Amino acid sequence: MYSLIEDIKKLLSVMLPILVAQISTAGITFINTTMAGHAGSDDLAGVSVGAGLFYPLLASIVGLLMAGTPLMATLLGEKKPEGLPYVVRAGLLIGLVIFFLFGAAYVLFIDDLLTSLTLEAEVAYVARYYLMTMVGVVFFISMIVPLRCLTDTAGSTSTSMKLFLMAPPVNAVFNYLFIYGHFGLPRLGGIGAGLATMLTYGFLLALFLIVVLKSSALKGHEIFHSILVKRSDVKEYLIVGVPSGLSIFMEMSLFSLIIVFLARYGTDTLAAYQIADNFASLVYMLPVSCSMALTILIATAVGAHDIPLARRYKKAGFVVALSGAAMTAAMTVLFRSSIGNMYTSDAIVASIAGQFLIYSAGWQLFDAISTPIQGILRGLKDTRVSFVLMVIAYWGGCFPMSLFLDHVVGLGADSYWLGLVFGVGCSAMLMILRLVYVERVMDREALPAFAFFMHRKITHPAAVHAVVASNVKQAKELLAFWERAEEKLASLVQDIKEAEVDIFTENRRVLPIGLSLLTDLHLCILGHATRAYIP
């Protein structure tokens, strides 16, 4: 007889190493932007622009490739480890395709993209070659993620943690060499930060290859002994991964768009939003790590056809996520003034940020429900409907509500935080409904998605058609909304342009943080980077 405490301990043993790895990755981003800032304002601006364009795409790529986790965990639960090499090779193949597509997009569109941003020549130069180094980063990360999925499932999440803990100091050394040009190397400034990132992930890939090849449990030699890839594995990888990647991209795009609408309220409000966003994103690592751990545990349990065990892990996940959110939300509210003062010495900005942090506390509580459920559903390979629900919650709920509160009710900048809380709340509600539906149908042994992936056949075609028809109807309603909102949106964008607020020029505010200087946009980039599912 297992107790809830034992299930929580098992969950934490998987979750905490993932959390440490997430923090290590955020450390790479922080080191890059901080050291680039000391190289000069043009270098920092170029890195900020390049990172702002790149990280939403990278997060989506990682979200897609992390689909290997439930696929491999399910195989292990089914006691079919011989299938692991095929899934890993499928992930590596998809990663290679993504790399070539990203490289081609860079060559074809980089000139037009930078021209459309109307950047200063020095900033555009740094951004161009920073993004060139990111092509290499895409290759290395696309190779790392499938291997990480393997080590997390067939090995231990502590393996990834140990490897990622090596990354920040290695990255700092490379930054020191290439940004500032020490030991006879050329001084590359912000471009050096990109080169350092690429070399750091290359170093990580080498470490992962060594670990995988040395472990018989990870079947490293079997993975690279053949290049055979099963079409069914590639198809399943994409079916599970594409909705996850798109969900991340849609979410991050919304946060980026909100910055544009907040720009008309002035630099103080924009800076305060980005402080609150950055802090909330750091806190968000907790439910994300819980979600990733739940994916591994539940996929393994489902693969073993142990549904009661999967339900126990679900319960443990909610206890951990909600307990953590209650603590972080309480600390956010109680210490909001201190948090704002940690980011900036500007009293006005800190005061506005304190108000925004109150809203972020509500956001944290809803996230503690929504994010773990996403991990549970991912463990069941149920991602397509979850993606539709995410789009409805954020783009059909959060964004329209923000515009309504701002332009109809007149709540000003607070409208966008209230809209975010509303959107995350809608996401939590929809995810609960989806999970309840999934569990009920599993009880009847007729879950369409579950039956399709676990048994390779559809037991109830009528149920599948009903779900598809419902999703199509919701998508049509969402498109209709966008058509109605198009004129209003164009008008708002024009108002912002007329206000002459440009977050990409040197007129942006610079916030002193400790011994470093972070710009408004810098803080935003850090927030987006830590929110991402980057390995």
Residue ranges of each PLM-predicted region?
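Short alpha-helical transmembrane segments in multi-pass integral membrane proteins
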Residues: M1-I18, M72-F139, L185-V242, I298-W363, ...
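N-terminal transmembrane alpha-helices
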Residues: E6-T34, H38-A39, G52-L71, L96-G103, ...
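Transmembrane helical elements of multi-pass membrane transporters/channels
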Residues: S13-T29, T133, A167, T200-L204, ...
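Helix-terminus/linker motif at the lipid-water interface of multi-pass membrane proteins
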Residues: I23, G27-A45, L114-A121, L177-L188, ...
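Interfacial/gating helices of multi-pass transporter permease domains
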Residues: A36-Y55, V87, E122-V126, G190-I191, ...
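Small-residue-rich hydrophobic transmembrane alpha-helices
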Residues: L44-A104, I141-S160, I259, L270-R336, ...
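Short runs within selected transmembrane alpha-helices of multi-pass transporters and secretion channels
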Residues: L65, M134-D152, S160-N171, A193-F208, ...
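A detector of single, family-specific signature residues
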Residues: P448-P535
